[in-house]
Design a protein with these regions (language model features):
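Glycine-rich flavin
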Residues: 1-77
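Short, structured patches in soluble enzyme cores that scaffold and shape functional sites
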Residues: 43-45, 62, 73, 88-91, ...
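DPxDG-like acidic metal-binding loop motif
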Residues: 72-113
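Glycine-rich phosphate/pyrophosphate-binding beta-alpha loops
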Residues: 74-79, 161-168, 285-288
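Glycine-rich beta->alpha junctions and the first turn(s) of the following alpha-helix
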Residues: 122-216
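C-terminal helix-coil-helix/basic helical segment that borders enzyme active sites and/or dimer interfaces
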Residues: 217-248, 258-269
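Non-transmembrane, aqueous-exposed alpha-helical and coiled segments at domain scale
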Residues: 253-254, 314
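Glycine-rich phosphate/cofactor-binding loops in nucleotide/flavin-utilizing enzymes
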Residues: 266-314
Length: 314
């Protein structure tokens, strides 16, 4: 709802396009509020599209009264459970047109539409509850009015509202907090499911908790600052801070989980307690496209040293 709601309201559209967007998103919102519909957002395809460097290979070819969608999404969270798949695809007027990022379309594909299939298993290191199986679109007809954003507006959003790609960070900020909270309760002997034994009196435990608290507060500080700056047309400094916040949250969540396991000791890694899951889930955060940890580092280094349009050609 962020992309089709507040974010879309900040972007440029002519009056006709904006009115149509208001009408179509009202349909989606009514489904969610009145019918309890679940919308998923399949994104990755196994190539460079999710990183924002090429057009999505999933296509939506214009047809009478709608589009015909063809393609595949991997790591499709809620595959088989969602009612609609908010699918990023490339709109084409004809099947042989050259795909362009500027023609990206954000389309709600009904899960029960003919040609939608869910295949494969889901047995990863972490994020097991997302059930992110592979989603296939085989000549799927999607009617007009299914747009979540008007054609081309996603491309504008990616260029002008880059904080839109930080929407996974709250979950990992929560994991970071959970790792710290687990440690405090465990050392105080107050954790449900663990022996009521206090371990807080040991200096090594106190120092470890202090280190964890410092890392948690530093991570929160940059994250809240970046979130407060989310909006259209951010400055270069704000974009660099967004990359830094994304990197810090995703990496520090796992670092805190590691410290929690080391500090609490062997019992804390039992599957009957939450810390084992927090550790596995948090390790996956730095892999999340389009702003993986590696991409954030690459962009921070380059954009700090180069102004737009600069190069080293003689």
């Amino acid at each position: 709802c962020l992309w089709s709601g507040a974010l879309a309201d900040d972007l440029e559209m002519d009056g006709v396009v904006r009115q149509r967007h208001h009408d179509t998103r009202a349909v989606h919102y009514r489904r969610i509020l009145d019918d309890g519909a679940i919308y998923a957002q399949p994104f990755s395809e196994g190539g460079s599209a999710a990183a924002g460097t090429v057009a999505f290979s999933t296509t939506a070819v214009r047809s009478d009264g709608g589009w015909v969608v063809r393609g595949k999404k991997i790591f499709a969270s809620l595959a088989g459970s969602a009612d609609y798949y908010g699918t990023l695809c490339t709109e084409l007027q004809h099947a042989d047109d050259k795909p362009s990022r500027s023609n990206t379309l954000y389309l709600a594909v009904p899960a029960k539409a003919e040609g939608v299939r869910v295949v494969g298993d889901w047995d990863p290191l972490g994020m097991r509850a997302t059930v992110s199986r592979t989603l296939l679109f085989e000549e799927v007809f999607v009617p007009d009015g299914s747009e979540l954003l008007p054609p081309g507006v996603y491309f504008q959003a990616a260029s002008r509202w880059p904080h839109m790609f930080m929407t996974l960070t709250p979950a990992y900020m929560g994991l970071a907090q959970a790792a710290y909270d687990f440690t405090v309760k465990y050392l105080r002997g107050e954790l449900p499911g663990a022996p009521p034994v206090k371990r807080r009196m040991y200096p090594t435990k106190q120092l470890a908790v202090a280190d964890m608290r410092l890392m948690l507060e530093q991570t929160k500080a940059i994250w809240f600052q970046a979130m407060s700056e989310a909006g259209p047309n951010p400055t270069k400094e704000q974009i660099l801070r967004a990359y830094a916040a994304q990197y810090s949250v995703m990496e520090n969540a796992n670092e805190l989980a590691q410290l929690a396991i080391r500090t609490c000791g062997g019992l804390s890694m039992l599957k009957s307690l939450a810390l084992e899951r927090i550790y596995r889930d948090s390790r996956c955060g730095s892999l999340m496209l389009p702003w993986t940890a590696e991409i954030c580092l690459d962009r921070i280094g380059r954009e700090a040293l180069y102004e737009s349009g600069e190069n080293d050609d003689a």
